[in-house]
């Protein structure tokens, strides 16, 4: 029997279904829908945070919620296909607007749920995660995130962790290039360790699939289909990397006397406990608990007393795009955390 508090996660299906409807009305309608949804979620987060109740620590995960994510994976492929059909004969402006609307969903939700499924021990779920990331032409995330970002988050060694004073626009080229390079280095190292050839590499095959899909789309739908797919992928990746920028901005793990990094703690990620955006994003904003317990299902994540964002991700994406505004909001929070909240919160989180 589903727990009442978990029924809010049914909102996960709202965005792709609404996007499917709006794609059928053309690029302008799809773009207006996207802006409207973004504004509503950002506004609700800002003016009615509606803080969630954390589940009791001993609560068992709800298996049906994994099914919701699996259904979403199917919906995303259908949404991209619908967008391709609409874009093939559309004006170039409509191609761009359709790609932006679809990329909003595949980035805000698709990559978020690929991330959740990729943390699963289920082969099916990990396969769906690879499918979702390949559908936005970013399969190397599946290597870099789990083998690179998680061990190195909140350090200067991690290209996906933003440094204090680093603007989003300086961060983006660094993380895009660094994550791609490190993913292939990690994959090569693992293949050597396992004494396997590149023919066994899912990263290689997924990357070849991106090339194959590109060629097939060009042959089937011409330049418009190809541009649509790559543009929606670019929008999705931009959303992903902007969220990465937000999640660990300015937070650093100390280097211990032996040269090792201190363990990841509650103070090494920014959090936002907003009920609407967390319902749409599978509790991704409870980011400290996620990093401290990476295999935890999203519905069991706790709201820990770590550093708090000024609003949810929907609003922070806009704030981060304006560096002076972002720095003005975040640097006092960094200083406040360093001045005393960190020690108190880390004691509480370990009780």
Task: Please report, for each region that a protein language model flagged, where it lies by residue.
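Cytosolic/stromal cytosol-facing helical appendages immediately following the last transmembrane segment
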Residues: 2-20, 122-125, 129-130, 134-201, ...
